[in-house]
Amino acid sequence: MNTWDRAREIAARVRIKTEGKPSFLDRLGNSMLKPWPGIPIALLTIIVSLGVIIGAGKFLQEYILGPLVGDVLVPFFKMIISYIVSEGILHNVLIGEYGIFTIGLEWIIESILPFVFLFYVVFSFLEDSGILPRLSVLFDSIMRKMGVQGGSMITILLGYGCAVPAIIGSRTATTKKERLMISAIVCFAVPCISQTGALISLFAGFSPILLVLMFLLSFAVMMIVSSVLSRIIKGKVDPMIIEIPNLLMPNGKAYAKKLMLRMKNFFLDAEVPMLISIVIAALLKETGLLEKIAVYLEPIVSGWLGLPRSAVIALILGIIRREMAVAPLLEIEGLTALQAFVGGTVALLYLPCLSVFGILSKEFNTKTALAISLATTLNALLVGGLINQLAHLFM
């Protein structure tokens, strides 16, 4: 008798097996692992999740946070600061065109916060309920065509919250090739939730079709990048091994604690750099440096991309935070639908922010971080410019 047979004999001797009727969640959990009805349920889950994030986010933005910022907070801070600080650079940095307490509150609280909060509400629920691992199993064949295993889907989805934890989460990959590919895919084509919130706000004045096209473009770039990298990077991708927990309702206390922790990290890791970038924008505007930089970048910004000259601030601030490549576009009057889509495309594909560059350097090396940053920047300008030029050619 070999070791395995001996182990089975001992287990059978000491284990008591009782037949019980599976609960509804047990039956649903098992069904979600099969192509039918698993794939329709998975697609419905994704659609409902996006509906909650975008629909409820727009409601919070329009009826609660928008009035709170525009009618209460901004007038309050303007009154206080105007009374305390006299006209000058400091006054303009605080409540001017790019003021911390004017445009800063609008971008952070009204344009981005509702979508970030709802993303983490939905993602944490999918994570704690056991739905995410089942999605990984169902989409394993699709993920393998991208050169990674299905289990990597969870890590990539995490990138829609923030690229930093997604890159750190790539440590779970079983090969170096897969880990590098996951990190590159997140940097090239996955918008963080702050950037997604800014894009939703940008396209709200035009058509929801633009947002759909943007995500289709993101997916297309993701497939192309993964296909190219799978041929360039040497190595293999191991078969998927993933633990499938029971399908259950999340524990309320643990769920709330996780949600609070993620929002705390968002405010510390995202909003502080965003405030810094707003200060930089205000200083560039007040000192006249913005106009000087715009002169040198005008052939790219206005000529190739077809964007207004003032959009140069988006390219500068996007280096600090990805959503800041979108936020300045919200303030440009007379922006056309094509310009909004081109600007959104460049922002979507633009180089990783400073925090992502830092984590890439730490997890891999500085050479890899520089290579990804240069490649994403060139890709963003190339794709954005091609869309603009082709649109003018056929329109």
PLM feature segments, named:
Residues M1-A11, V137-V148, M223-K236:
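Short, non-transmembrane cytosolic segments of multipass membrane proteins
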Residues M1-G29:
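Switch/coupling subdomain of P-loop NTPase systems
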Residues R6-I16, I232-M263:
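Interfacial helix-loop-helix hairpins and adjacent transmembrane helices
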Residues P40-V48, F117, V121, L216, ...:
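Generic alpha-helical transmembrane segments of integral inner-membrane proteins
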Residues I41-I109, F119-F125, S129, L135, ...:
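Transmembrane helical segments that form the transport core of multi-pass membrane transport proteins
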Residues E106-I108, V122-M181, I185-I193, L199-I209, ...:
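Membrane-interfacial helix-loop connectors
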Residues P165, S170-E178, F188-V190, G197-N246, ...:
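Juxtamembrane and boundary regions of transmembrane helices in multi-pass small-molecule transporters
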